[in-house]
């Protein structure tokens, strides 16, 4: 079980999430890997999760009718949200809002085929009070096996 240096799934997700719309991260996505990117902003963490799950399904990053894929994605999203929110998933209840870019990457980061596929979710953007100018940058990463 050796992590391939060119197949660092978390790094790829972070670079995709950090890239501005007019930037193209210089990435060589391994053959057979899938990914999607998008934006989400809300005071509701459920809406943040739903937007990313919908993007992953509509871009065929995960299969819609396979529970374990949705479950793996959910845990990767929650892990990334913990990073952005410093372990406090609450947003609206404590008057916080987020504006995030996200990337979801699915692939095989290990050289052993038995290790299977993994999913990485990267979030980058701002979090703060729902007042323009009262936010700061935040970043989060979640990785889970499928």
Curated annotation (Swiss-Prot):
GO MF entries: mRNA binding
Q: What are the alphabetically sorted keywords of the record? A: Activator, Histidine metabolism, RNA-binding, Transcription, Transcription regulation
GO biological process annotation, one example: positive regulation of gene expression
Keyword Transcription regulation (UniProt): yes
General function of this protein: Antiterminator that binds to cis-acting regulatory sequences on the mRNA in the presence of histidine, thereby suppressing transcription termination and activating the hut operon for histidine utilization.
Q: Which family does it belong to?
A: Belongs to the HutP family.
- Cite the record's note on assembly: Homohexamer.
Q: Tell me what this protein is called.
A: Hut operon positive regulatory protein
């Amino acid at each position: 079980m050796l992590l391939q240096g060119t197949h660092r799934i978390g790094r790829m997700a972070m670079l995709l999430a950090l890239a501005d719309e007019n930037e193209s991260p210089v990435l060589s996505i391994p053959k057979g890997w899938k990914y999607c990117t998008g934006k989400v902003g809300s005071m509701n963490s459920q809406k943040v999760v739903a937007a990313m799950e919908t993007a992953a399904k509509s871009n065929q990053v995960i299969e819609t009718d396979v529970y374990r894929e949705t479950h793996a994605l959910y845990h990767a999203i929650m892990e990334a949200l913990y990073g952005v929110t410093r372990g406090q998933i609450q947003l609206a209840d404590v008057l916080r809002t987020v504006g995030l870019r996200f990337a979801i990457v699915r692939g095989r980061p290990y050289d052993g085929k038995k290790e299977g596929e993994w999913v990485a979710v990267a979030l980058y953007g701002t979090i703060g009070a729902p007042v323009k100018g009262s936010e700061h940058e935040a970043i989060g990463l979640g990785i889970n096996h499928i």
